[in-house]
Every structure is written in C-alpha cells, then in structure tokens.
Design a protein with these regions (language model features):
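Cell-envelope/extracellular polymer assembly enzymes that use nucleotide-activated donors
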Residues: 41-43, 72
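Acidic helix N-cap motif at the loop->helix transition within catalytic regions
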Residues: 53-57, 82-91
C-alpha cells in the first residue's frame, strides 16, 4: 500500500521537536506515557510562538473547563525565543494533563497544530489559539454539539463565532475583507472562519489536506470531506501579554495564493457516497444442499 508523503514529513518534524535535549523535552516523554495509561476523551491543541505571560493563565482555564474529565493539553511551541519554553517547563511540574512539543525551527501555526494532532490521544480534538483571546469555558458548548451529531453518524466540526471582537479597527476591516473573499470564491458561509476555538473528531481532522495556513480554511475543508460545520457564539477578549504575530499586508498577500490553492482542492474533491464492507454469509445461515438419494 502506498504511503502518504505528507504524513511522513509531519512525523519527521515531530521526531525533531522531541529530540531537543532539554528538561522539558525529557518530560514530554513521561507525560506521553501518563496520557497513554488512561483513556483520553479530548485533546486540546494549543500552538504558541512567543506567548510568554499567556501560558499559565490559559492552562489553568483549560483545566477548569474540563474538570473531572479525562483530557490532555498539548502545547506546541513553534521555536519561541522568549520565555515561553521556560513557562511551559515550569507548568509541566504541576499539571499532569500537560504535554509539550517543541519545533526546532519555526514552521507556522498550521504545522504546529498538525504536530499536536499526530501526537494526540483523544477521539475529539479541540484547537485553541495560545494568545488567550478565546475563552476555554466555551469548549463544553462546542463539544456537546459534536457528541450529539456523532450519535446520528454525522461528521461535525463545531467552530466559534466571536461576539464583540476585541481587535483593532484595521484588523476588523481586514477580517471582513477576508470573509468576503472566502464567501465569494470558496462558498464559505461560516461567519467567522478565522476564530481559533473549535472541536472536531480526530478521524475527521486527519482526513483534511495539510498545507501551510490550512487552519484558516477548515470550514471549507471539512465540507469538502462531507462534514458539517456548526457555528457557536463564543466570547472574545483582549490580550493580557504579548503582541499579534500577523501583519495585515503579509496576511493579505499570502492569503491570495492560499485561496487559489483551496479553490484547486475544492474543485478536485472526490465524489463518493458511504463505503460499506460486504461480508460473507455466516456458516449457520447458509442453506445446506440436500443430499442426493442413493441409487
């Protein structure tokens, strides 16, 4: 059977991030062992790059949102050069649900999410921006929708819709422009594709094509695979530390090529219904052929 080159590349990147010889890297292994000993209902992936000051408050909020649950938090440090690594290392000593992966070189937010996804143990995957602007207390509302839909056999991603966004006027304007482009060219009807908080089944997430900046187009990609996207109103708040990593002009220029690539993907989506395996009739249900009478 042919292997998936993209999957191989992602796995190599994870090995590199785990090969960092530091106290934090050693604890990644022990945390992974703990996570594998107990069933994990949901894995929360938090990609970060230079988010010192936001680390511990957000971890504590995630733990509160999933109190008395089997969960894991996977932080993916995308080669931060501030105190992010130190803050994550300190948190490992007191938060047993925490795991930390570290990229040896900067790879971007989508690559960080992918690294966490490949290491996650939960059947459900939650994604959360590491800047603290999304509120972890909104996770249960998203999770309940996904669980209810899965009982009906549907593949669903529950995605946040930010209420009263606490961003600059320029960033809000850029966001509205991006929303118009996605709606016009990708038929993306989700009101807030850029919102960082979402939950979906791990099996569905793994089916989505991986490329740089794919996290911005997840509603379109989920629908491409026959999934349903449900929007949930969520809170939004200002940062308590650090600055945004995105520049509006850079985002616009990169976004144009991304949209063209996603259009290419959507037009080539395979058309196929459900697949069912045909099983042999059990021996007990087979009709025995009558014996011929003796001559």
């Amino acid at each position: 059977m042919a292997s998936n080159p993209a999957s191989k590349t992602s796995k190599r990147n994870v090995v590199k991030s785990g090969a960092v010889k530091s106290r934090a890297a050693q604890k990644v292994g022990s945390a992974s062992v703990r996570a594998n000993r107990n069933p994990v209902e949901i894995s929360i992936l938090v990609p970060v790059m230079n988010e010192a000051g936001n680390i511990r408050p957000l971890i504590d909020e995630i733990c509160s949102a999933f109190a008395n649950r089997q969960f894991e938090i996977i932080y993916i440090d995308d080669a931060s050069n501030d105190a992010t690594a130190n803050e994550l290392t300190a948190a490992l000593d007191t938060v047993p649900q925490l795991r930390v992966l570290r990229h040896t070189q900067r790879a971007g937010q989508s690559a960080a999410i992918r690294s966490g996804l490949l290491q996650a143990n939960g059947d459900l995957i939650g994604v959360l921006d590491g800047d603290g602007q999304n509120v972890p207390a909104d996770f249960p509302a998203l999770e309940s929708l996904v669980i209810a839909a899965s009982k009906d056999g549907k593949m669903v991603m529950a995605a946040g819709i930010r209420q009263r966004r606490d961003d600059s006027a320029m960033r809000l304007l850029a966001s509205r422009g991006a929303k118009w482009v996605r709606a016009s060219l990708l038929a993306d009807t989700h009101p807030d594709s850029g919102c960082g908080i979402k939950i979906l089944p791990r099996t569905l997430f793994l089916q989505l094509p991986f490329f740089n900046h794919m996290h911005r187009f997840m509603p379109s990609l989920v629908r491409r695979h026959g999934g349903v996207v449900l929007g949930v109103p969520v809170a939004h708040r200002p940062r308590i530390a650090g600055t945004s990593k995105y520049r509006i002009l850079d985002r616009l220029l990169v976004g144009i090529s991304d949209v063209l690539g996603v259009i290419w993907l959507l037009r080539r989506a395979p058309t196929q219904g459900a697949v069912h395996e045909v099983l042999a009739t059990p021996p007990a249900n087979k009709k025995t052929k009558p014996k011929e009478a003796a001559q």
